[in-house]
A protein has these predicted regions:
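Non-heme di-metal
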Residues: 1-179
């Protein structure tokens, strides 16, 4: 997406700052998990607090790059990103790993690519639901569940308010049992 920084070194710097802060956040959450498992609660909390700070720093730079849109735009961008990951990035990584004698890593790249493909499909399906106003309404009768309290409603639409906990329809999703 074009910004006032497009084509400048500042744009590259913003992209690098976003990437660096994003990677730092992930590392610190991993480090927090290790510290917690080893019994260092204070250190774990400091890693997590710093990770949360890094997330906000990354958000500053991503917003400057106009990286955050409305939900439909974000779903489209997410789907496009996942498409790149499974069709190009991981496919290329797997090919390189194979050529360099790392067949196990190549296989893992391919497995992750398959997951990224599923992510793309999920985002595209959700985007279609947003674009067709089908997130909270369907043409056929469905079972809707309040994500807050678990109340079940059967009908073509989620209710405007949950009759049990009074949360808005934004808290409803299609009910599925996976057991």
């Amino acid at each position: 997406m074009a910004t006032k920084y497009s084509g400048t070194q500042t744009e590259k710097n913003l992209e690098a700052a976003f990437a660096g802060e994003s990677m730092a956040r992930n590392k610190y959450t991993y480090f927090a998990s290790v510290a917690k498992k080893q019994g260092f609660e204070q250190i774990a909390e400091l890693f997590q607090k710093t990770a949360d700070n890094e997330k906000e720093h990354a958000k500053l730079w991503f917003k400057e790059l106009n990286g955050i849109g409305d939900t439909a735009q974000n779903l489209g961008a997410a789907a496009d990103g996942e498409n790149y990951e499974w069709t190009d990035m991981y496919a290329g990584f797997a090919e390189t790993a194979e050529k360099e004698g790392f067949p196990e890593l190549a296989a893992r790249f391919r497995l992750v690519a398959a997951i990224e493909k599923r992510h793309e499909e999920r985002y595209r399906a959700l985007l279609k639901n947003v674009e067709t106003a089908a997130v909270f309404a369907r043409s056929e009768v469905k079972v809707w569940e309040c994500r807050n309290c678990g109340h079940i409603v059967v009908g073509t639409n989620a209710p405007e308010l949950c009759p049990t906990c009074l949360h808005p329809k934004a808290y409803f999703e299609l009910h599925t049992d996976n057991f």
